């Protein structure tokens, strides 16, 4: 039976981790053990961050919609409810962009939702 020495495999694995850790400060980018811990932690943070990004953008869109609709004398919840009753299926992102970019179209939309 031939003895298996894992030198190449281990070196590749360590190089991969150290490459991911490039840009970190101090030992976090130089020493394998510390870099491995930091890479694992940063990957967890980035995973959670991608989930939080969706929540934060939705909050931002709702906040913008509420501000824009209150200028027209209607609050956010009533606006969304009336749009739902009229079967206007625009999501919060596109409504928010409409309120920011094309304010006249948004005003017409709010006026049509009042009827």
Swiss-Prot record:
SUPFAM superfamilies: Ribosomal protein L20. Transmembrane segments: none annotated. It holds the Pfam family Ribosomal_L20. It is found in: Plastid, Chloroplast. GO terms for molecular function: rRNA binding; structural constituent of ribosome. One of its GO terms (biological process) is translation. Its main location: plastid. The keyword Ribonucleoprotein applies. It comes from the Eukaryota. NCBIfam families: rplT_bact. Binds directly to 23S ribosomal RNA and is necessary for the in vitro assembly process of the 50S ribosomal subunit. It is not involved in the protein synthesizing functions of that subunit. Belongs to the bacterial ribosomal protein bL20 family. This is Large ribosomal subunit protein bL20c. It comes from Cyanidium caldarium. The gene is rpl20.
């Amino acid at each position: 039976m031939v003895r298996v020495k894992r030198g190449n495999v281990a070196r590749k694995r360590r190089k991969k981790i150290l490459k991911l850790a490039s840009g970190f400060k101090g030992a976090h980018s130089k020493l394998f053990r510390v870099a491995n811990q930091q890479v694992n932690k940063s990957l967890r943070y980035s995973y959670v961050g991608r989930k939080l990004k969706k929540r934060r953008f939705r909050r931002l869109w709702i906040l913008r919609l509420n501000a824009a609709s209150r200028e027209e004398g209607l609050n956010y919840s009533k606006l969304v409810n009336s749009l739902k009753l009229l079967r206007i299926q625009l999501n919060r992102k596109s409504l928010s962009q409409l309120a920011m970019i094309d304010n006249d179209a948004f005003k017409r939309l709010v006026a049509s939702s009042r009827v």
